[in-house]
Amino acid sequence: MNKTQALEALNHDRARNSFLISTIEKLQDPEIHAADGSFAVYEPHDSTYLFSLADGGALAQLEPMLRHEYRSFYVNDLRFAPQAEQLYSGAQIQPYLQYYIESSEFVFDENELNGGVQIVKLDRSWTDYILSVYSQSEFSRRDYINECIDTLPCFGALWEGERVGFILVHTNGELGPIAVDERMRGRGIARTLNQYMFREYTRLASIGCLFVLIDNEKSHRLCSASGIKPMGEIMWVNI
């Protein structure tokens, strides 16, 4: 299936397929597989596959078509966890709530901004600061942070000249992470960072998405306050 055909099919449910759509849009010649209304897309930055499944048997149907080795994959519906566990022995499943943002609907809202915070584009001088406050082992690597800063719309927050927060876009196009110094929380700095990042990101992609751990209530509140819409529970699977 070619890029145009895949986007036409996936756009029938843009929210549910937001991650696959944004991935296909940014790739010149994406690897796409389809079977009976289900889809698999290869994401080359992270060497993962992204699945949109129509039924419980679709994962087993698509798997033999895949051309690359992979150690993790995404499925846009947590209900298919039993099928993933059956097909991949020892699979480790991590559920998330997925949010999405339609670029055509985003309006830069100055009411969300804190006028006391200065927002700047990130450069590599921020890398040490980011590593000092961002401790997720999978992504807390200097080379990874530098690649995000060099290639994607990432921003930092300054309060009276001091670094107090940042927001990144992952190399696979996923929005986030965002971090604000604990002593500076409650001042709208995260919402301000979101507004600047969304403004740049929506110029690059027709739709964006992010994933929040189910029990991360602070991030859920921030997403709701920022106008990002919930799509549903999804899963990342390590095999």
Labelled PLM ranges:
Residues A9-R71, W159, V164-P177, D181-E182:
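Conserved donor-binding loop and adjoining core beta-sheet/short helix segment
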Residues D181, R185, L213:
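Residue-level recognition of the GNAT/N-acetyltransferase active site
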